[in-house]
Each structure stands twice: as structure tokens, then as C-alpha cells.
């Protein structure tokens, strides 16, 4: 295969990954805009990640379509592509790290007001990438490197210092935070007396699967760069590195939609509306439309509400994100009629009051998962 064929193959992979990421991130942002029940501290971080990824992928796609693969001179499109890759990728990684930290903060450290860190997140997630980008531009090290433009092949020190060094740190720190969070939640679930342990494990998985997607999508980059450092340049790791690193936004978006029934009910109702005009899937469309705002609660007690209502802070539990902040992280997503939903809301309010009294009277750690914690 010639060098030009390699470049064309790289560009094709880039376009496929960029287009899929654009579609996925757009769906998440539309859902965040249209569905107010989705808006909380965690989903805000995810939406900012998606907005950053969308910005990066749109510009990258336009440049890839317009940029000639045989161009050898560094012009404005070349510099813009390098800026988008460096700034956009670093910002997306940092938003993922902030998501890892926020989940750890909520679950393990039991932070009652995670929103107070958001202003620092903004400064960090956009400030550090800006510094790396400015240094890259000021040192005149941008060159065409195959299917895109970036730091030239002869500047390994800059590549590591401005890009891969921060990446390895972010990847490793995210993995550690996921491990600590998983260890904590697993130990609490295992020591509980709940009849819903399977649902609690599903809840735990849905808390951390965003981070797992990040770790998996970028592990190929780590393997490929290690091989490159050993002066090995195999095709398969390079292709996997290119595809999964660029399509990270797509897989993160799919994970978000999977975690939130609001999303697939909302888009499902909109999609089936087309067929219902022709008398097809009418009942299914109506049921989704009626229940599109029914984001089922998690199987775990909402710790923030419990603490706000005076529950003993020494009780060990797996916190959700408060009533206003609850994500749909349940194992079963039952669709109900409006009447059934109203009855269940009244029933849930009664049980929430019962749990509050139960927590005040009993400080046993196993109370977090008693069998009244229903979905």
C-alpha cells in the first residue's frame, strides 16, 4: 500500500468517526436542551463534553473534506486542524476526568454540593488546553502528518509534553478514581441486606460506564504510542487508535442515551410519530409520548435529601444525585399510564417519609439497601 493510499484510508476512518460522533453528541445536546429532567450536575458535565467534542468534530470534518491529502505546506487549514486536535482533545479528556472526580465526590466523599466546583472545572478544562495550544503555535512545530496536521514527527518532546503527557495522567487518574468508586460501592452493596443487589450493581455500572468508555476508546492510543516508541508501526493498532480516539464522542453519547430512558423515550416517540401518520405503531408511539418525562428513580436512597432532612451523616450509603438531580440509572424502565404514574408518585412519597424516620432511628450501614428501596 502506498503512502497516498494510507493517507486516504486514514481520512476515510476520520470522516466515519467524526460523522458518528457529531450525530451522537448532537442527540445528547438536543435531549439536554429539550428535557429539563435531565439537567443536573453530572449531565451538565456530560453535555459540556459533548459540546466540546461536537465543536472539535465539526471543524475537523470540514477541514478533512476540504484539505488535500497531498498538501505538503502548512497553511491556515493545517494550523486550524492542529489547534482543534490539541485544544479539543485535551478539553474532552479533562471533562471526562472532571466527570470521574464528580462521581467519586458524590459516592465516596459524599459531597453535598458538587456544583460549587463547576467554575473550577471550566477554568481547568479550557485553560490548560489553551496553554498547550498557545505553546504549540508559538514554537512553529505544526506540520502535515499524514491525513491531518499536528505537531511534526521530529518533535517528540513537544508531543509528549503538550499532549501525551497530560493524556497519560488524565487516563491513569480516571482509572484510579473509577477503581476507588467501584471498590467502595461494591463493598457497600456486598455488606448490605438488600433484595435488590443486582439492580444496585446495575446502578453502579451506569455510574461509571462513561469513564469506562473513555478508558477503552483511548487504550488503543496508549498501546500504539508505546509500540511507536519501540520503533514499531503496525497497521492494526494505528487504525484502532485513529478510529476509537476520534469516535469517543459517539460511544459516550450512546452510553448517555442507554443510561437515560428519557432520551430513548423522547426520540422514540418522535421517530414513531412518522409511522403513526400511516397507522403504524400508534399505540407504541402514544405510550412513549405519555411516558417520555418518566425518568425512573434509582434503586438507591437519595442521600442528599436524607442528609438535608436531618438523617445521620454517619450512615454509609450509595448517594444518588438528589431528587432534582436524579439520573435514570435503574435496571428496569417500566412504562406506565399517567394514572399509574400518579399513584406510584404518591406511593413513593409515602415510602420516602418512612425511610427518613427509619434512618433517624437506626444507624446500621445495611439500611442503605433495605428491601423498601424499590425502583
From Swiss-Prot:
The keyword Transmembrane helix applies. One of its GO terms (cellular component) is plasma membrane. It holds the Pfam family Dicty_CAR. It is found in: Membrane. Keywords: G-protein coupled receptor, Membrane, Phosphoprotein, Receptor, Transducer, Transmembrane, Transmembrane helix. GO terms for biological process: adenylate cyclase-activating G protein-coupled receptor signaling pathway; culmination involved in sorocarp development; negative regulation of gene expression; positive regulation of gene expression; signal transduction. Residues 359-375 have a biased composition (Low complexity). PROSITE patterns: G_PROTEIN_RECEP_F2_4 (PS50261). GO terms for molecular function: adenylate cyclase regulator activity; cAMP binding; cAMP receptor activity; G protein-coupled receptor activity. The keyword Transmembrane applies. Residues 31-44, 109-119, 181-204, 260-375 are cytoplasmic. It is a multi-pass membrane protein. The modification Phosphoserine is found at residues 192, 298, 303. Residues 346-358 have a biased composition (Basic residues). C-terminal Ser or Thr residues may be phosphorylated. Residues 338-375 are annotated as: Disordered. It comes from the Eukaryota. The chain crosses the membrane at residues 11-30, 45-65, 83-108, 120-138, 162-180, 205-223, 235-259. Residues 1-10, 66-82, 139-161, 224-234 are extracellular. Belongs to the G-protein coupled receptor 5 family. Receptor for cAMP. Coordinates the aggregation of individual cells into a multicellular organism and regulates the expression of a large number of developmentally regulated genes. The activity of this receptor is mediated by G proteins. Plays a key role during tip formation and late development; involved in cAMP-directed patterning of pre stalk cells as they sort before and during tip formation. This is Cyclic AMP receptor 2. The gene is carB.
